[in-house]
Structures are given as structure tokens and as C-alpha cells.
């Protein structure tokens, strides 16, 4: 058996994996996004190992507000989400990325999570929720405080929807308290910060490893977690106290 502590990157293949980074910056393209700087660090690791990486800046798309899969069926004149959702389902790895404002996630981040939730009732071929068998993480940038709070919110939301979260699946950078330079600004120290660089690297590799494991295993085993079977009356050994 291979000792995992001595294995190198050539020990695994990732060239059949797909990753999607969603940048939830408030800035439309082509305005510079500090979050993009952190995305580029993580993305370069994945691409170096053959992962097919897609990326989108959510604010560039006409994503309607709501909690239905297609909001044009609920009064909105247009909705870019159905097309984005197809990209989400095509990805083995999802990384939600965004800025911190007032110690919290951006409004764009919250909208993307709401729309992911809008599709959470969709089932896969095994009768599980559609996000099963996929992994997720998050990257955050900002000033002063809020990285752990924001990561907690994002990662909880994603696991609740069905994503599998690996160890240390978040990374971020924040500046000193008070007004000051952001991640990509000259003199910020962000790109040189060892703590941020380490966590970004660990997050990226843990996403790769867990995505590899799930893909090789055919996803999460389909027993005890199938909504279609539960609705049909199967209770998977759940003891009904009324019959005791």
C-alpha cells in the first residue's frame, strides 16, 4: 500500500475533473476584483494538474432574485440562473468566492446561495439530491474581520444543500483594522501572506483529493439518503416510535 505521506502529485490523476469558481465580487468586469487575485492562486494549482476549470463573475449575469429554479416562470422578465445551474452540475468542484462587507458575505454571494438552494429539490438518477457526489469550498477577501464567520455561513449552506466539504475548505485574506489596502493593492502584503497562501493551497488540494475519491467511488452510496425512496414509503431502518 502506498504511504500517503510520501506520495507525490504524480500519484493521482485529476484530468477528468471539472471545477467551477464563482466570483461574487460586487464589481462588474473588467473592473479589478481583489477576490480574483485569490482565485487565481487556487485555480493555477488545479490547472497545473489538468483540471478543466471554468469561472464566472456572478454580477456580470442577470441572475434574478428568488428561490425557484427559473424565475421567468414567476414573473421575472429574464433569469440567467438556469444556464449557470447547468455549469454548476457539470462541475465536480464548486468554489464560492467573494468579498466581506460589514463582517458578512456580499449580497451577490447570498443571491448565488439562494439560487443554489432554489434547485436543491432536484434529484439525481439515484434519487439523491442533485448536489450529492460533489465537493465545495470558499475563498474570501476583505478588511478587518469576518473570514471565519463568512466561511462558516457559506460552507454550512453548501453542505446543507448536499455538497461534501473536505477538511480546511476555506481560505481568505483580511487587512488590518480600519481603512487600508485591499488584497491586490501595492503594499498590502496579501499575495505574500504565508497563512493565506498555505490555507489556499491546502483547500485546493483537499478539494482535489475528495473530488477524486468521490468520483472513483461513484459518488455517495445511494442508500438511506434517497428522497425518492423516502417519498415512496421506505424508511431505511428508521424506528417509528408509534409501533414500539
Spans of features found by a protein language model:
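N-terminal beta1-alpha1-beta2 submodule of the flavodoxin-like/Rossmannoid cofactor-binding fold
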Residues: 1-126, 190, 194-244
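A short small-residue
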Residues: 20-23, 175-190
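Short, glycine-/small-residue-rich phosphate/pyrophosphate-handling segment
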Residues: 33, 125-179, 195-198
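Short aromatic-enriched loop/helix-cap "lid" or pocket-rim segments at secondary-structure transitions
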Residues: 65-69, 151, 179-181
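Short alpha-helix boundary/capping motifs
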Residues: 74, 164, 182-187, 235
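A general structural signal for short secondary-structure boundary/capping elements
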Residues: 101-103, 145, 183-189
Amino acid at each position: 500500500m502506498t504511504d500517503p505521506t510520501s506520495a507525490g502529485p504524480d500519484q493521482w490523476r485529476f484530468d477528468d475533473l471539472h471545477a467551477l469558481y464563482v466570483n461574487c465580487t460586487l464589481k462588474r468586469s473588467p473592473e479589478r476584483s481583489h477576490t480574483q487575485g485569490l482565485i487565481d492562486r487556487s485555480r493555477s494549482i488545479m490547472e497545473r494538474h489538468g483540471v478543466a476549470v471554468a469561472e464566472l463573475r456572478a454580477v456580470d449575469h442577470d441572475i434574478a432574485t428568488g428561490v425557484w429554479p427559473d424565475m421567468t416562470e414567476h414573473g421575472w422578465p429574464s433569469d440567467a440562473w438556469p444556464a449557470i445551474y447547468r455549469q454548476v452540475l457539470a462541475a465536480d468542484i464548486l468554489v464560492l468566492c467573494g468579498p466581506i462587507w460589514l463582517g458578512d458575505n456580499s449580497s451577490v454571494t447570498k443571491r448565488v446561495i439562494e439560487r443554489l438552494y432554489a434547485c436543491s429539490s432536484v434529484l439525481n438518477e439515484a434519487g439523491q439530491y442533485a448536489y450529492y457526489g460533489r465537493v465545495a469550498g470558499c475563498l474570501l477577501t476583505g478588511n478587518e474581520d469576518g473570514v471565519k464567520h463568512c466561511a462558516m455561513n457559506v460552507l454550512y449552506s453548501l453542505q446543507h444543500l448536499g455538497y461534501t466539504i473536505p477538511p480546511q475548505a476555506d481560505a481568505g485574506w483580511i487587512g488590518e483594522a480600519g481603512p487600508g489596502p485591499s488584497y491586490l493593492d501595492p503594499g498590502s502584503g496579501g499575495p505574500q501572506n504565508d497563512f493565506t497562501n498555505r490555507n489556499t493551497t491546502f483547500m485546493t488540494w483537499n478539494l482535489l483529493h475528495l473530488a477524486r475519491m468521490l468520483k472513483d467511488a461513484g459518488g455517495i452510496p445511494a442508500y438511506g439518503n434517497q428522497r425518492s425512496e423516502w417519498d415512496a414509503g421506505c424508511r431505511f431502518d428508521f424506528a417509528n416510535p408509534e409501533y414500539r
